[in-house]
Amino acid sequence: MFNEVHSIHGHTLLLITKSSLQATALLQHLKQSLAITGKLHNIQRSLDDISSGSIILLDMMEADKKLIHYWQDTLSRKNNNIKILLLNTPEDYPYRDIENWPHINGVFYSMEDQERVVNGLQGVLRGECYFTQKLASYLITHSGNYRYNSTESALLTHREKEILNKLRIGASNNEIARSLFISENTVKTHLYNLFKKIAVKNRTQAVSWANDNLRR
């Protein structure tokens, strides 16, 4: 059972993989780099309890189809205040399969080094997601199938409100990026985050929500 421990961020890192010296070293590196508490859990063993606020890093290199189905089912029944990130994900892992993961907040591919993982997790601790541009675009487009429970009362960041207001005047992603001096990939990531927060499926619904809830 996962003992409840918390970091200064209010989060706990749970690395789910096969026990090994390499896995232990990775966990220690992440704990030190992120100033976060953490625990290693054997991917082949069941997990009865996960503390609220947990950030779960699941090693896809050690997961066969049976284990993937087990963890998807187990994690889908857990507290909504958890975040799941896939580690060592095969480059050809289908987007539709990524979409099946509950509470998914990031995907690290097998070619990414530890520092990329650290940087991605730092973003997740700030409330961001970690996806490639193509994956973020796919998830935004298919957000109606994305199994993430959200509420309209979720607080939006200042940047998310700026982007929503740009949507209200019909701005494209490229136009939003140029006007806010950020990359188009960053715009798509912000869109994906705010779509989750306000529980909408597309830009039209986001604009409708903004018209009802935001001042210009």
Swiss-Prot record:
GO terms for cellular component: plasma membrane; protein-DNA complex. Gene3D superfamilies: 3.40.50.2300, Winged helix-like DNA-binding domain superfamily/Winged helix DNA-binding domain. One of its GO terms (molecular function) is cis-regulatory region sequence-specific DNA binding. InterPro entries: CsgD-like_REC, Sig_transdc_resp-reg_C-effctor, Tscrpt_reg_LuxR_C, WH-like_DNA-bd_sf. It comes from the Bacteria. GO terms for biological process: positive regulation of DNA-templated transcription initiation; regulation of single-species biofilm formation. It is a peripheral membrane protein. Its main location: membrane. It is found in: Cell inner membrane. Disruption phenotype: No curli production. The master regulator for adhesive curli fimbriae expression; necessary for transcription of the csgBAC/ymdA operon. Plays a positive role in biofilm formation. May have the capability to respond to starvation and/or high cell density by activating csgBA transcription. Low-level constitutive expression confers an adherent curli fimbriae-expressing phenotype, up-regulates 10 genes and down-regulates 14 others. This is CsgBAC operon transcriptional regulatory protein. It comes from Escherichia coli (strain K12). The lineage of its organism: Bacteria, Pseudomonadati, Pseudomonadota, Gammaproteobacteria, Enterobacterales. The gene is csgD.
